[in-house]
């Protein structure tokens, strides 16, 4: 599973505020909410929360891609996330 490999890398750094760690946490929350919404389609409050978390993760990924493209590519590949479209 992807989670174990990423956790080992992040726990070595012990940087809870790093962009990678925040994106990792948001990705876990997104996956949990997505599975919840498959069962509860009319849970609109959770849908709103999911959209907010998606926006936060998108902003963090945009920041990381501007600052360090190599770390961005590694994180995208580790978490199995699609690359965001840039304007």
Curated annotation (Swiss-Prot):
Transmembrane region(s): none
Main location: plastid
MF term (GO), any: structural constituent of ribosome
GO CC annotation terms, alphabetical: chloroplast; ribonucleoprotein complex; ribosome
SMART domains with a match to the protein in the record: Ribosomal_S15
Tree of life domain: Eukaryota
Cystine pairings recorded for this chain: none
Location within or outside the cell: Plastid, Chloroplast
Subunit structure: Part of the 30S ribosomal subunit.
NCBIfam families named among the record's database cross-references: S15_bact
Name the UniProt record assigns to this protein: Small ribosomal subunit protein uS15c
Organism this protein belongs to: Nicotiana tabacum (Common tobacco)
């Amino acid at each position: 599973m992807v989670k174990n490999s990423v956790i080992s890398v992040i726990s070595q750094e012990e940087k809870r505020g790093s962009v990678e760690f925040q994106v990792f946490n948001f990705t876990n929350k997104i996956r949990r909410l997505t599975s919840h919404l498959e069962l509860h389609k009319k849970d609109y409050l959770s849908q709103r929360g999911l959209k907010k978390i998606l926006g936060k993760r998108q902003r963090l990924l945009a920041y990381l891609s501007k600052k360090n493209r190599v770390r961005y590519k590694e994180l995208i590949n580790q978490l199995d996330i699609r690359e965001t479209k840039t304007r």
